[in-house]
């Protein structure tokens, strides 16, 4: 699968975001940001991931300094900082504006879907965050093209 990303960035830009958020990006995520710096889904939502028998259509995987409104990791993570666990980034969203989050370290490390708007059946105040993958690389490998 070939992903079309935003403009290229450098290590200094990543370090600036890491320092601002006081987070160290996992190496696989840093490599993704350096290579394509996020992406917008093309066509009919482009890609999706299976989540408990539901398919979540990815809208955007955020980048750094993208020059595209509402596509920046820093902007979204700072806006929802109070709702997020420590060492967590908001890395993207789906078409219903649920968020894909990356817990960067600790026992809960991995990628999750955060259904803050309770769009999924079964989401409520007691459970609206769903585990997807142990690492960002595993998450990317689960992406499929929507026909």
How should these model regions be labeled?
Residues 98-104:
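Short, surface-exposed beta-strand/loop micro-motifs that present aromatic residues
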Residues 92-93, 104, 115-116:
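Pocket-edge structural micro-motifs
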Residues 118-142:
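Compact, glycine/acidic-enriched structural inserts
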Residues 96, 107-108:
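Short glycine/proline-enriched coil/turn segments at helix->beta-strand junctions
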